[in-house]
Amino acid sequence: MLPSLALLLLTTWTARALEVPTDGNAGLLAEPQIAMFCGKLNMHMNVQNGKWEPDPSGTKTCIGSKEGILQYCQEVYPELQITNVVEANQPVTIQNWCKRSRKQCKTHPHFVIPYRCLVGEFVSDALLVPDKCKFLHQERMDVCETHLHWHTVAKETCSEKSTNLHDYGMLLPCGIDKFRGVEFVCCPLAEESDNIDSADAEEDDSDVWWGGADTDYADGSEDKVVEVAEEEEVADVEEEEADDDEDVEDGDEVEEEAEEPYEEATEKTTSIATTTTTTTESVEEVVREVCSEQAETGPCRSMISRWYFDVTEGKCAPFFYGGCGGNRNNFDTEEYCMAVCGSVMSQNLLKTSGEPVSQGPVKLPTTAASTPDAVDKYLETPGDENEHAHFQKAKERLEAKHRERMSQVMREWEEAERQAKNLPKADKKAVIQHFQEKVESLEQEAANERQQLVETHMARVEAMLNDRRRLALENYITALQAVPPRPRHVFNMLKKYVRAEQKDRQHTLKHFEHVRMVDPKKAAQIRSQVMTHLRVIYERMNQSLSLLYNVPAVAEEIQDEVDELLQKEQNYSDDVLANMISEPRISYGNDALMPSLTETKTTVELLPVNGEFSLDDLQPWHPFGVDSVPANTENEVEPVDARPAADRGLTTRPGSGLTNIKTEEISEVKMDAEFRHDSGYEVHHQKLVFFAEDVGSNKGAIIGLMVGGVVIATVIVITLVMLKKKQYTSIHHGVVEVDAAVTPEERHLSKMQQNGYENPTYKFFEQMQN
């Protein structure tokens, strides 16, 4: 009896030890997730190797319902007990998306917000609480809302406490992707600004992909071209902003009331994120901090050769920059890297050791080592609505300081030449060389300061555009979620959001045009990033517009006005793009006799021919008409079936497409070629992207097919005629060659046989044999 009981207990203990834990993620390398991008096959995370893989059946694309998403999770992870799904907090970059019925998958990435497949019993996320941050939570047992609702609650709660939302997670599930509470971590603004590179990496990308230590401007005339170009660009942007503000004055007063507290709450963060130095640190400390950072490739996957300062070796070393993100320890050349970091590190060693340290062969003064009175006053002033005026004053102060210093050097040079009249010839040459190097140093220093000024100004303008777009998107989504929604208010919010996106696109295009005029080589380096940025704007506008059609009543009432707004924006964008690329010109300094590019038949390509992007990626369209929207009784913004109407057997209203790029314009610049992301983009699902065939492209394809068909038919007819003619000519009726040695009788007999004569004797014997 006792041995049997012991054996039973041992068997039970062994079975429990081998039992799979209730937490299905235990022992898995990655969390079960799925990602969707309309027009492409769904992707799912391989929990064994941590890589994204396409749909195993090769047929499943984006799913419009939460029930369908849960079912799909259960299909791709049959060995796991999937009980619920929840939208992820942050977007991810996924490559190698596949299309239906195509074996080859494209390698360029898409940025999507995946869905997490929850395994077993629901367990809340373990949130990390940094120093000086607070952990909070809210639960309401009478409310059952989506992930987006609770994210908004957490963000507003942190804003009321003058803090930023650091991280959050859902609590108490009550349905598929619906919950009764949220847990979150709020951090002070200063703490968030210290971690801004990691928390808002995509937002920083917008300041990086055209910035950085781009070009060593040693020519003063070229610097002036850059400054004039940037002045005109920013002036145009500010004029458009003023016009847009007038256009939206007819909107609801709620919009203005919501905008004021947002600007007050984010003013401090914006100023911290966009300035290249701070008011509490000296210039040397900032440069020392920059040069002490590790080389960072960034999230993008380009292979750009750059240099960074290695503190351990005390010299600059090469590395590959991805094209976006990263940090400021990133220089174009080794000389520029040593000019910035070498002198500062040498001064640091001099302070710590008390012994003089050689500055090395580089004699160029740097922006960091220059007198900070001219530039720092602008850099230390937070950006505001008067940014352009502050930039003009800073530039004037910089030029005045440069002229004064150059005048002082010239006076010293003249005095030295007078004193060197009686010196040997070698000493005179040494004096001249000394002052020539000093003048070159001042010119290089002024060029670096101008470049720093322009980069800071561009970053601030970009930050203002980002903030306005983010605010417009949040107000637009809030208006859609109102109960009941007000169509006029929704349209005004949508109008402001579309204008914000268009200003961002125009700002990007104008900046690239100025760079192309001043430095074509630099333009060639950043053109793929510019194209990626434009594609992201198109996709984001498509997704945001698709949210409108989840509220059919509102969409139907304002459909005509939305179509008119989009058509107006399309015409304006086409004009801007046509003016930009119709006759590109390259600046050659003071040479005013250079022929135009149309005369020399020179073309400047915006993107490489063998790039990764196609024309289809740049053709956003109005997703579908109001009459094709499925009924949505609950006023919630959820993902829907985002396929084009033609693929779903539905009608689409004409003239409702978003801004497209004309095929005639595309033929002039080859546009078949990485992602800036901000917090305003995380509130909607990236999978809602729509594709449609371009009408102009279809016409060209039809004409090409017709011409090809005619050519093929002609070739077939000619071939048949020649074959038939060959058959007719194969029968030979020529003269039979006769031996010349035969007798005249035999020759006569041969002629008779040719005319049909038959020998009676032969004929007789043939009849007898038959």
Curated annotation (Swiss-Prot):
Cu(2+) 2 binds at residues 677, 681, 684-685. The record marks 704 as: Implicated in free radical propagation. Zn(2+) 2 binds at residues 677, 681, 684-685. Residues 131-189 are annotated as: CuBD subdomain. Residues 1-17 form the signal peptide. There is a cross-link at residue 763 (Glycyl lysine isopeptide (Lys-Gly) (interchain with G-Cter in ubiquitin)). Keywords: Amyloid, Apoptosis, Cell adhesion, Cell membrane, Cell projection, Coated pit, Copper, Cytoplasm, Cytoplasmic vesicle, Disulfide bond, Endocytosis, Endoplasmic reticulum, Endosome, Glycoprotein, Golgi apparatus, Heparin-binding, Iron, Isopeptide bond, Membrane, Metal-binding, Notch signaling pathway, Nucleus, Phosphoprotein, Protease inhibitor, Proteoglycan, Secreted, Serine protease inhibitor, Signal, Sulfation, Transmembrane, Transmembrane helix, Ubl conjugation, Zinc. One of its GO terms (cellular component) is perikaryon. Induction: Increased levels during neuronal differentiation. The chain crosses the membrane at residues 702-722. Residues 135-155 are annotated as: Copper-binding. Residues 28-123 are annotated as: GFLD subdomain. Residues 18-701 are extracellular. One of its GO terms (biological process) is Notch signaling pathway. Residues 732-751 are annotated as: Interaction with G(o)-alpha. Residues 28-189 form the E1 domain. A motif (Basolateral sorting signal) lies at residues 724-734. It is found in: Cell membrane; Membrane; Perikaryon; Cell projection, Growth cone. PANTHER family: ALZHEIMER'S DISEASE BETA-AMYLOID RELATED, AMYLOID-BETA PRECURSOR PROTEIN. This is Amyloid-beta precursor protein.
